[in-house]
Design a protein with these regions (language model features):
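Soluble small-group transferase modules, centered on the S-adenosyl donor enzyme superfamily
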Residues: 43, 112-192
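The AdoMet/dcAdoMet-binding core of the Class I SAM-like
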Residues: 1-86, 93-102, 107-109, 122
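Short catalytic-loop micro-motif centered on adjacent basic/acidic residues
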Residues: 86-88, 114-115
Length: 192
């Protein structure tokens, strides 16, 4: 799902980008939807076993609404009983209060929120939230052939050093947009 049809067209038609994404847009498992994710979830009755929520960072109120309790409530309604959603949640190192605001907001709608982080070469230390209806239990074994993830490395994803530990934050709601304010203040310190 992407709001901009030109983005999905570009990545589904440009030969270099098709090669880079291994022709993912042409897989029979993929259905491209160009719509506002918030509105689409409100109007859609499908259930999902897995959702990747990879929105741009909450730099303004239009994007901030996609990180609100209202949005996560819609997501909760669309997840199957054993469904999982992974949510891009900014950097717990550079935007610590923003990150924990997202975790708290996911929890506020009754979803289990499992915070984790990983080093992403193009972004640095980056945070995610695994949202589910049941508490997440880490697998004991992982599929063969994975390049980076294993039973030995996975536990480190869920360990937060002292400078990324939880901090107090408000639930992000449509009527307060707390996350947008946290995000703006924190990233201004990093990129003046």
């Amino acid at each position: 799902m992407d709001l901009d049809p030109e983005m999905t067209r570009l990545f589904s038609q440009n030969p270099r980008l098709r090669q880079l994404n291994q022709d993912a847009f042409h897989s029979p498992k993929v259905r491209v939807v160009n719509a506002d994710a918030f509105v689409w979830l409100e109007q859609n009755a499908e259930f999902f076993d897995f959702a990747v929520v990879d929105f741009p960072d909450p730099t303004n109120h239009s994007l901030g609404k996609l990180y609100t309790s209202a949005f996560y409530r819609l997501l909760d309604k669309r997840l199957s009983a054993n469904g999982l959603a992974v949510i891009q949640s900014t950097s717990p190192m550079f935007a610590r209060q923003s990150y924990w605001c997202i975790v708290k907001t996911v929890q506020s709608v009754g979803l289990c929120a499992t915070p984790y982080h990983v080093y992403v070469p193009s972004f640095g230390e980056w945070g995610f939230v695994l949202a589910s209806k049941q508490p997440f239990i880490q697998p004991v074994q992982y599929p063969q052939g994975l390049r980076f993830l294993s039973a030995d490395t996975a536990p480190n994803l869920f360990q937060f050093p002292k400078d990324m530990q939880p901090v107090d934050a408000e639930v992000n709601r449509l009527n307060n947009q707390a996350l947008v304010h946290y995000y703006e203040a924190e990233w201004q310190k990093v990129t003046p």
